[in-house]
Amino acid sequence: GVQSSASAVAGAAPASSLAAAVRAPKRRSADQPSSRATMPVAERFVSINGEGTCAGKLAAFIRFTGCNLRCGYCDTMWANVPGAAAKDEAPEQLAAWVRQTGVECVTLTGGEPVLQPLLPQLVELLLGEPGPNGRGLRVEIETNGAADLGELAALRARVGDAAPGSLSFTVDWKLPSSGMEQQMLPANFRLLGARDTVKFVCGQGDLPRALEVARQLDLPGRVPVYLSPCFGDIEPARIVEFMQENQMTWATAQVQLHKVIWPDVERGV
């Protein structure tokens, strides 16, 4: 995930040729209803991916408004609240924008993107794009673990290798410090494989639970697992120590790069 404002993004954009792609969308007022044929976009921009298997790589981010959770440490609450400012854009418009950016990695985030009824349509369009190098786009959906992934997993299985692009899921398991663990859907995690990622954002006291859940869901060796610190609540070194103490050779400790590079920027990075 990633965040920031249009002016901040313009200053942080990796290349001037991407400047047009980094513009924040025009906003509709909170009381203007979203068209059924469009999706509510809080922001879209190009930056580096801050976490996961594509960390450090340029990516086109599309952030949708709305979320079904209220995590205590949420850093994108501005996009989650009812009536959050957004621009209504059709899937075809978003696919055209991604094409314009000239980047290979695409991250669909939020909010909670899986709540968007038109997300499967957008994903199918993106998977059909040839991408800048003719190898297709690497499409990633960042999701909170509490929205059913069944339809999207079925789409991935149906499309298979017929489309040039690839689809992966980065799925959170919310730990006790989030206040949302009871909302997790274990069935989602049975749909995941080697191309996907399970992410645990850890606060003080969460690490033993993360290990317990990883084992219960049979994640080690089946799905890549990332452990990230809840900034300001736990030192990253403690995560490394816990991994050492428990021989967690199958897990990866990771800090969010965008928060290291732009610690005071909230949107567009």
Model-derived regions: residue spans:
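Residue-level detector of structural "landmarks"
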Residues: 6-8
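Short alpha-helix boundary/capping segments
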Residues: 11-21
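Conserved Radical SAM active-site core
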Residues: 18, 29, 35, 39-46, ...
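Alpha/beta catalytic barrel-like cores
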Residues: 22, 26-28
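A detector for short, charged/polar N-terminal pre-domain segments
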Residues: 48-50
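S-adenosyl-L-methionine
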Residues: 52-55
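Conserved AdoMet/S-adenosylmethionine-binding subsite of the radical SAM
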Residues: 95, 115-269
